[in-house]
Amino acid sequence: YREGYHIKYDMCRFTYCMSRIHTHYKSTKAVKGRTKNTHDHILGSSLVGECVLDNSDIFLKDEKGFEKMFELYLHGLLVTFVTKEENDLLAQLRGKFLTKDKYNEVGIVLQDKEGNQVELPAPPKILTEWEIKKFGLKDTGYKPIEIEPKKLIQFV
């Protein structure tokens, strides 16, 4: 790497790395703790940014545009705790599977602090609609739990 590259890299990823809302959901493999674990942002920052730019007309002109953008932004801060291997597998699915289907595709089972099996909150509909249009993906029909933006505060 070039000299000083790590500083530029860290600065570009500051929001992504330093801003997170912990769901306190962990994959069953991460709970076992036999491998290296990491945080996974449920929505990648580049995915959120690209969706916002491609839908700027909605976010700028729609009466509730800011609310829709803020909901997307909040979801982009949600993190789970998974194994490094699971995180790497999830990263490879961008543009191949809808975000709402990725954990199922990799076979990641999540649990909360008490050990109860849980589901990820559904990403905002605008993201799923955008992924279908942008990447030509098919909807599997899987319907994750929908959470209003105000209720995302439960994770803070």
Named regions from a protein language model:
Residues 32-74:
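Histidine-centered nuclease catalytic patch
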Residues 38, 80-84, 110-112:
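A structural signal for short, well-ordered beta-strand segments and their strand-loop junctions
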Residues 48-59, 84, 90-94, 114, ...:
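Generic local-structure boundary detector
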